[in-house]
């Protein structure tokens, strides 16, 4: 079996609310850490979410 190209990652809120999204990314084309601006329902505003490993 070949190694999977897409990997699951966790996007953790930078507002320190503990909220996170789980998404996939292509590990070959996106080698750097993913940063996205998304809605945090705990903080009730759009904040940056940074990539973290799923444990």
Swiss-Prot record:
**Example of a GO cellular component annotation carried by this entry:** cytosolic large ribosomal subunit
InterPro entries per record: Ribosomal_bL33 (IPR001705), Ribosomal_bL33_CS (IPR018264), Ribosomal_bL33_sf (IPR038584), Ribosomal_zn-bd (IPR011332)
| PTM description | The protein is methylated on either Ala-2 or Lys-3.
Q: Which biological process, per GO, is one annotated for this protein? A: translation
Name the Gene Ontology molecular function terms of this record. Answer: structural constituent of ribosome
Pfam families documented for this protein: Ribosomal_L33 (PF00471)
Keyword list (alphabetical) reads: Methylation, Ribonucleoprotein, Ribosomal protein
Protein family: Belongs to the bacterial ribosomal protein bL33 family.
PANTHER family per record: 54S RIBOSOMAL PROTEIN L39, MITOCHONDRIAL (PTHR15238), LARGE RIBOSOMAL SUBUNIT PROTEIN BL33M (PTHR15238:SF1)
Q: Per its record, how is this protein called by name?
A: Large ribosomal subunit protein bL33
């Amino acid at each position: 079996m070949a190694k999977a190209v897409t990997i699951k990652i966790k996007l953790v809120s930078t507002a320190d609310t503990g909220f996170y999204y789980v998404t996939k990314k292509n590990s070959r084309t996106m080698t750097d850490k993913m940063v996205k601006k998304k809605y945090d329902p705990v903080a009730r505003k759009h904040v940056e979410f940074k990539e973290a490993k799923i444990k």
